[in-house]
Amino acid sequence: TSNYFRYIFQNTQDLVPVKNELEHIKNYMEIQKMRYGDTFSYEIHAEEGTENIRIPPILIQTFIENAIKHSNTFDDPIIIRTDIAWMTAGGNSHENIQIQVMDTGCGFSEDILQSLNSAIPLEPQNGHRIGITNAIQRLNLLYGQGEAVITFSNLPSGGACVTILLPAI
């Protein structure tokens, strides 16, 4: 837990290795386990070779926080899964990294899904959408407009899925 705060307050880098970010979200999820007990669990999977790819710090946590906040009331157990894998997209010869944050909650409502996946920038509303808006803006600044892609979907089994596709650096 002190590691969690150290990462938050001492990290001034634009990009960090995936392994550092995964260690950070593990610390964050352990704090959430203390908070929610048996109604919360998590899984983290990273494909071999992705650990040294550099990504923006706190990027994954932003979407994990949203999953926890919007999943449900924790009357039913929730699982949050984070997957990181190599991905070749759109015929590009260079590789990308795909980050997925999935949960077993209630998923996105159709109007929220439509809004999140539209090309229209999100406007923060009453303290909501600030994390998502900041993440999108950071990705555009770091990688260039349209080079990093975020899509939002609902899983067939229920729950939400956020997929982030980044150039492998």
Where is each model-derived feature located?
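Two-component histidine phosphotransfer core
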Residues: T1-V149, G159-C161
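Short, surface-exposed beta-strand-loop junctions and turns on beta-sheet-rich folds
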Residues: G107, A168-I169
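Short C-terminal beta-strand
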Residues: A160-A168
